[in-house]
Every structure is written in structure tokens, then in C-alpha cells.
């Protein structure tokens, strides 16, 4: 039973971490962190991401323009770029490390403890990747809400709203956190069968020694 739980936890943890990493990469590059709908022209919509701003028109389609300067960006977008890059890198390392700790990859019976440590390290990296993905999307969402309800801005001025990439980033961060938790559960459960195995071997050896002692006494 413990073996089945460990295998399921490992596969589910790696799968969720992989899903979260892919979604965090998409969140990083999609230009849909903010949406702006113009009341005067309903056929024209604006979107903003970490790297570019796009305008969507029914006749022309989507046209995007990269930001000219990194320093000219708002603080939340500058920090979000760095954190999202960090999240993508940590998520990739977490997948790589935890992959070597899976039971389906045979690296020798004497290296069970090493595989357990790899799963723990992979879980920690997935956690870090999830946190560094949740922080930027939550920060941008918070600033968007503040600007939307800013009383100093006239009512006729269009306001930015949540884009699809923010929800994608939240889902990515939660998937990475849950994947890291499952990897830790798998690592903790992988220690118990090993200990019980050693106990069974020791108990068998004691039984053999007891039988040998009885046979010796009968001969005498």
C-alpha cells in the first residue's frame, strides 16, 4: 500500500509541477496581464503584458509593440519580469532534480537515500517556483485594483482590468505549490518501507540464529 501511495504521489507531484511550469512560462510571455476596453470604440481593445502592449482591432487584427525601455516601466512590471524569469528557472530545475528521484528511474538500491533527498530538493524548488510566480501576478492585480478605484482619476478615463494571464499565473503558482507538497509526501513515505525492510531482515537473522542454537543444544 505504501509503495502504491509513493508511486502515485511521485507521478502526481511531477505532473502538477510540469503543468505549473508550462503555465508559468505562458504567463511570462503572454501580453494579457491587463485589458483595456474603450467605451468610445468598442471594436478596439488594448492588452498589456510584461514585454509588450497590443491593440486588437476587428479589421486589422492584433498589433503589438515591445516596450522601449526597461527603466521606463512601472516598478511592478520591472520586478515581475525578474520574478517570472526566476520562477521559470526554478521550476525547470525542480523538474530536473525530482525526475532523477523517481522510483521508475533505477540508480541502484544503495542510493535510495539519495533519491529521497532529490525528491525533497525538487519539492523545495517547486515551492520556490510557485511563490515567485504568485508574487508578481498578485502584485500586478493589486496595483490594477488600486488604479481602477482611484478617485483622483476622472470617471470618463478608461481603466485597466484583469487580463487572462493573471488567472493563468495564479493557477500555475498553485499547481507548483501542490506539486511540491506531493513530492515531499512521496519522499517521506519512501523512508518507511526501507526501514521496515531492514527490520524484516534483522528479524529473519534472529530467527535463524535461534534455530541454530536449538539444533546445537539438541545435539549435545
Swiss-Prot record:
PANTHER family for the chain? CLAUDIN (PTHR12002)
Residues in the Cytoplasmic compartment per record: 1-10, 103-117, 186-220
Xref: Pfam families? PMP22_Claudin (PF00822)
Q: Which GO terms describe its molecular function?
A: identical protein binding; structural molecule activity
List keywords of the entry alphabetically: Cell junction, Cell membrane, Membrane, Tight junction, Transmembrane, Transmembrane helix
Family designation: Belongs to the claudin family.
Provide the membrane-side ranges marked Extracellular in the record: 31-81, 139-164
Q: Tell me what topology the record assigns in the membrane.
A: Multi-pass membrane protein
Q: Indicate the transmembrane segments per the record.
A: 11-30, 82-102, 118-138, 165-185
Which species is this record about? Homo sapiens (Human)
- Descriptive protein name: Claudin-22
Major subcellular location class: other
Amino acid at each position: 500500500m505504501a509503495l502504491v501511495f509513493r508511486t502515485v504521489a511521485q507521478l502526481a507531484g511531477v505532473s502538477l509541477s510540469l503543468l505549473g511550469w508550462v503555465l508559468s512560462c505562458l504567463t511570462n510571455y503572454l501580453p494579457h496581464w491587463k485589458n483595456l476596453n474603450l467605451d468610445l470604440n468598442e471594436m478596439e481593445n488594448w492588452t498589456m503584458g510584461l514585454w509588450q502592449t497590443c491593440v486588437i482591432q476587428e479589421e486589422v487584427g492584433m498589433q503589438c509593440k515591445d516596450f522601449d525601455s526597461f527603466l521606463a516601466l512601472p516598478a511592478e512590471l520591472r520586478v515581475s519580469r525578474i520574478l517570472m524569469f526566476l520562477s521559470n528557472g526554478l521550476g525547470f530545475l525542480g523538474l530536473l532534480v525530482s525526475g532523477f528521484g523517481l522510483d521508475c528511474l533505477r540508480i541502484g538500491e544503495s542510493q535510495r537515500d539519495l533519491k529521497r533527498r532529490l525528491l525533497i530538493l525538487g519539492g523545495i524548488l517547486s515551492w520556490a517556483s510557485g511563490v515567485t510566480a504568485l508574487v508578481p501576478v498578485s502584485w500586478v492585480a493589486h496595483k490594477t485594483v488600486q488604479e481602477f478605484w482611484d478617485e483622483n482619476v476622472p470617471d470618463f478615463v478608461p481603466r485597466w482590468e484583469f487580463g487572462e494571464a493573471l488567472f493563468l499565473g495564479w493557477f500555475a503558482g498553485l499547481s507548483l505549490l501542490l506539486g511540491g507538497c506531493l513530492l515531499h509526501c512521496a519522499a517521506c513515505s519512501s523512508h518507511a518501507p526501507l526501514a521496515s525492510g531492514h527490520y524484516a531482515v534483522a528479524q529473519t537473522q534472529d530467527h535463524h540464529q535461534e534455530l541454530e542454537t536449538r539444533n546445537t543444544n539438541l545435539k549435545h
